UniProtKB/Swiss-Prot annotation:
NCBIfam families: rpmF_bact. The gene is rpmF. Disulfide bonds: none annotated. This is Large ribosomal subunit protein bL32. GO terms for cellular component: large ribosomal subunit.
Length: 59
């Protein structure tokens, strides 16, 4: 006979949600930091061709 599963407690639900929110906040912070570093020119791991380089390649 089928028996219903026990209900997940509110505290366990809240702990899981808090973990998820913490991970999401950390990921958002990393993305914001990366965006700022790209805009200020501090990023070392990216290569963006400048307009001068593109004009030299076309010539």
């Amino acid at each position: 006979m089928a028996v219903p599963k026990k209900k997940t407690s509110k505290s366990k639900r809240d702990m899981r949600r808090a973990t998820w929110n913490r991970k999401a906040a950390a990921q958002a912070q990393r993305a914001l930091s990366l965006g700022k570093s790209i805009l200020t020119g501090q990023a070392k791991g990216f290569y963006y061709p400048t307009d001068e380089e593109e004009e030299q390649e076309e010539s």
